[in-house]
Curated annotation (Swiss-Prot):
GO CC annotation terms, alphabetical: cytosolic small ribosomal subunit
Family: Belongs to the universal ribosomal protein uS15 family.
Protein name per UniProt: Small ribosomal subunit protein uS15
Superkingdom of this protein's organism: Archaea
Segments crossing the lipid bilayer: none
Presence of keyword NADP: no
Subunit structure: Part of the 30S ribosomal subunit.
Keywords on record: Ribonucleoprotein, Ribosomal protein
Amino acid sequence: MARPEWVTYSDEEIEEMILKFNKEGKSTSEIGIILRDQYGIPSVKEVTGERITQILKRNDQAGKYPEDLMNLIKRAVNIRDHLAENPKDLHSKRGLTIIESRIRRLASYYVNEGALPEGWRYNPKEAALLVK
């Protein structure tokens, strides 16, 4: 797709904004929403030709783990904490099973893509340390 005419920012300015928001602790999805809603940049990839994560990797600021995997791990840790206090909550137990299944499938994909090290496995105890 072509670059929208109404975008007045240069590629360098957009990259500086992305790096600034990343230093402030914003996730890649939050950065994209901020750029869309406050700066009128509909899609970073359309404008710059690179995704936000590619820009962060090029500047050595990318996270160790992919954002979607980390979000699932956070949800699993929160449900495990909830189940520690409410062991009879069967709906949450099922939800935890489903989320952990998603984590394993996604981790398998990322290992094949090279985003995670070979042999990486989801471990709930390590996940709790990873998130906190």
